[in-house]
Regions:
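Terminal, non-catalytic protein-protein interaction segments that mediate quaternary/complex assembly
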Residues: 1-346
Length: 346
């Protein structure tokens, strides 16, 4: 079982060169990474530092979190921070509601997509659909509440749409599985088990690790569990030849004991509530629009009982409201920072 940097080093020195889509990558098949203490944020100042909101990668991490929490399948918001998204929309007929949409908004799959979104067959048999109409995350939570030792609390990050002709965004993460088990000292841990079919160790895993950690920590917090060890099983672990120089820099840092992964910690809900209210005040200072007052008030009210849902509502508003699309990228960056920091400490 490897750490992030061990995995990267093994790709470099043991990986094979392949050329999917005619692009050279160095790749290892069937690797595993183990993460403890939520150390999922790369902090290598001057080289790659997602903890710094001023770096390109730091800005992308925060924008991606806001976009994920919005549940939006559109690319206009996230394309401001990662241009590749503008090329990944589905190429369906104009009549298809998923035309130009993407399939890899992980927040949609976790917090918005019903657990049985595509099981219309159940409705034909007049079966009770209420339990499976709820989003996957809460379905998994319910399974653990019914049986704390359940092996069924699993989230599916894919859907049948990805198999259609015209799809450019074939979802990488496949599943995220939660199991609660008691350790030898009598404490409970929530095991956060992720399977991903294809993982770019530089441009993908850097941002995926924080997301998976957040989802696992949120589930654990709902059960009063503090420790959330995470295992990531990667079918294709690789990096592109264009990132070779950066890979060499990171490996060299590790040789001098200067490579750092730091912890991303989900705030206590009470702290989150106060910070979400502060974030709303900040957003209102830029958008003193009476048409938005009702939404802002609902976010503040919701933050008292369910701060994560409050964040989802705020992010959904920012990503989808036309007013927010007319402001500068710098303002959006600062809003992203406010929201990210209201949820996490690091």
């Amino acid at each position: 079982m490897w750490s992030y940097i061990q995995n990267l080093s093994n790709i470099k020195f043991c990986g094979l060169v392949t050329n999917p889509r005619g692009i050279e990558v160095r790749e290892l098949i069937g690797t595993n990474i183990w993460i403890n203490d939520n150390k999922v944020l790369m902090k290598c100042p001057g080289i790659r530092d997602v903890t710094n909101p001023q770096t390109k990668e730091g800005q992308y991490l925060r924008a991606e979190f806001v976009w994920y929490m919005s549940g939006s399948l559109k690319t206009d918001f996230i394309s401001m921070f990662g241009k590749m998204w503008s090329r990944l929309g589905n190429k369906f007929s104009e009549q298809n509601i998923y035309n130009e949409k993407i399939n890899s908004n992980y927040g949609y799959h976790v917090f918005y997509k019903p657990a049985a979104e595509n099981l219309t067959l159940l409705e034909e048999f007049d079966l009770d659909m209420e339990n499976v109409k709820i989003p996957q995350f809460y379905w998994a939570k319910n399974e653990l509440e019914k049986d704390r030792n359940s092996r069924k609390a699993i989230l599916q990050y894919t859907w049948p749409l990805i198999y259609l002709p015209g799809v450019n965004d074939f979802t990488c993460t496949q599943t995220q599985h939660f199991m609660i088990r008691e350790t030898y000292d009598g404490l409970e841990e929530l095991y956060n088990l992720v399977n991903i079919r294809s993982s770019d160790a530089i441009k993908g895993l850097t941002f995926d690790l924080p997301w998976w950690s957040f989802v696992g920590q949120y589930m654990a917090k709902l059960f009063g569990i503090e420790n959330t060890p995470m295992k990531v099983s990667i079918n294709s672990s690789h990096y592109y030849s264009t990132d070779e120089a950066l890979v060499d820099q990171l490996i060299q840092l590790n040789k001098s004991n200067s490579f750092r992964m730091t912890s991303l910690i989900l705030r206590e809900f009470s702290d989150m509530t106060l910070r979400i209210r502060s974030a709303v005040r900040f957003v209102k200072s830029y958008f003193n629009d009476k048409d938005l007052y009702g939404i802002f008030d609902k976010v503040k009210l919701l933050s008292e009982s369910d701060p994560i849902s409050a964040v989802m509502l705020l992010c959904n508003t920012i990503v989808n409201e036309e007013r927010f699309k007319r402001v500068s990228r710098d303002v959006i960056c600062e809003i992203n920072n406010q929201i990210f920091d209201s949820v996490f400490k690091y």
